[in-house]
Amino acid sequence: MSLEEDIVSDDEMNMIDEDDATDSEAESLSDSDTENEITEKLAEPTKTAIYNRDGLLDKLQDISWPEDVDWTHKLTVEIDQGGAVDVNDDLARETAFYTQALEGTREAFGKLNEMGVNFLRPANYYAEMVKSDVHMEKVKSRLLHEKKQIEESEERRKARDNKRMAKEVQSQKMKERAKEKKDNIESVKKWRKQRQQSGFSDKAGEPELDFESGKSFQRGGGKKRPGVSPGDRSGGKGRPTSRMGNKKREFRDSKFGHGGRKGLSKQNTAETTNDFKGGFRGGKASGNKRQKR
């Protein structure tokens, strides 16, 4: 960029700053004009305004305290601040408030003691509340109910948060286990590949790992107990059978078989078709039916 372009850009920036200053001045002037207009409108009396000075003085005389009224009815205390207080200074203003309240209390306390007026609350004073005990009991029960609801909602929220955290931890553990399993498989594959490259490629002498065949993930480890059916959860101790029961079971098994498909159990074969040893059993016809010739 050349020097002329820099100068032009600086001039443009100065012009922008001057425009901003002009806009701010115009806004301030417009605000001041608006305030002046409002002040003038407030200063001008309305067409329906009535200035009744005598009536105002009469009303002031009606609501003002009489000159001979007792001080106990007014309880007014005048405090000399000793000088002007800067209202913009927070510390000085608050100090003036505190001093005025303290000095006024001391002066009123002394006057009441001199007049012999009992203004302190006795020790056995019972201040009756505006609201009855029944109403306050209802308010108390409602507040306790709301507090209980808030606590229950907080407990439910904590339970949801704990459940969500438990799910996240469980999923993280599952991911870590899957990653660990994958790393183990990759390391074993890498080790075997290195053995093959080194000349040890005989797979007959290598042991079979459980995680490759999937046997480690089978339930029960593939072990079976003798004499226990696969669906027996009691381990063969659920229904102990007697010796006579075993004989009955053997006879039924020899007669009916051990279950399975029965669809072709009664189908004739060549041997059963040519077997006439048993003969034929002719049934007797009933008396109501005629015999076929």
Curated annotation (Swiss-Prot):
Biased composition (Polar residues): 265-275
UniProt superkingdom: Eukaryota
Biased composition range(s): Basic and acidic residues: 150-167, 173-189, 247-256
CC annotations in GO: nucleolus
An MF annotation (GO) of this entry: GTPase activity
Keywords: Coiled coil, Nucleus, Ribosome biogenesis
GO biological process: ribosomal large subunit biogenesis
Cell compartment(s), UniProt: Nucleus, Nucleolus
InterPro entries: Ebp2 (IPR008610)
Coiled coil stretches, renumbered: 135-190
Stretches the record annotates as Disordered: 1-45, 150-293
Pfam family of the protein (one): Ebp2
Family (UniProt): Belongs to the EBP2 family.
Role this protein plays: Required for the processing of the 27S pre-rRNA. Plays an important role in plant growth and senescence by modulating ribosome biogenesis in nucleolus. Associates with ribosomes.
Subunit structure: Interacts with NSN1.
Protein name: Probable rRNA-processing protein EBP2 homolog
Gene: EBP2
